[in-house]
Design a protein with these regions (language model features):
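Enzymes that bind and transform nitrogen-containing heteroaromatic metabolites
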Residues: 1-168
Length: 168
């Protein structure tokens, strides 16, 4: 099954105009430690929001796009697919020995949740109410339980917690 990683605030906002809403060092460190050596799955816009539009180093990068002409610089750790089902087939056949992380954006999160493909969400909750134009999709909280929650930390003026939610 797939795991979601996201950083969201009290309003459910995850981004604004192609950029992450928060740059929290501990969140980035946590993200890196979980995903290194594993598979990250993202939509094209999330990929294009990465620094220099380059794949994440030391990870298998799977980019989902509807654009059949979409291409990126040749790399042995980047795969372009055109649907959730193609991403699922690729990960389950070629990368069954790795963990699979869905890293955004909102539409990709929604599709994986709607298909029932996610069994764990690793969320950084920021105690802030900033607005943005990209939100984490609504999900049925009754179907999930909190497996882990960190103590509240503060960095860059924002209190935050790490939570791991697992599917009931």
């Amino acid at each position: 099954m797939f795991k979601i990683i996201a950083c969201i605030n009290k309003r459910g906002v995850i981004g604004n105009h192609g950029k992450l809403l928060y740059s929290i060092k501990n969140d980035m460190k946590n993200f890196k430690s979980m995903t290194i050596g594993n598979v990250v799955i993202m939509g094209r816009y999330t990929f294009e929001s990465l620094p220099k539009k380059k794949p994440l180093k030391d990870r298998i990068n799977i980019i989902i796009t509807k654009d059949n002409e979409y291409n990126v610089e040749a790399s042995d750790n980047v795969f372009i697919v055109h649907s959730i089902s193609e991403a699922v087939e690729l990960t389950t056949t070629m990368f069954s020995d790795k963990e699979w992380f869905v890293i955004g954006g909102s539409t990709i999160y929604r599709q994986f949740l709607d298909e029932g493909l996610v069994d764990e969400m690793r969320l950084t909750y920021v105690d802030d109410d900033a607005e943005g134009n990209v939100k984490f999709p609504m999900f049925n909280t009754d179907s999930w339980y909190t497996y882990y929650e960190s103590l509240t930390q503060t960095e860059s003026y924002f209190p935050f917690t790490f939570r791991v939610l697992k599917k009931k």
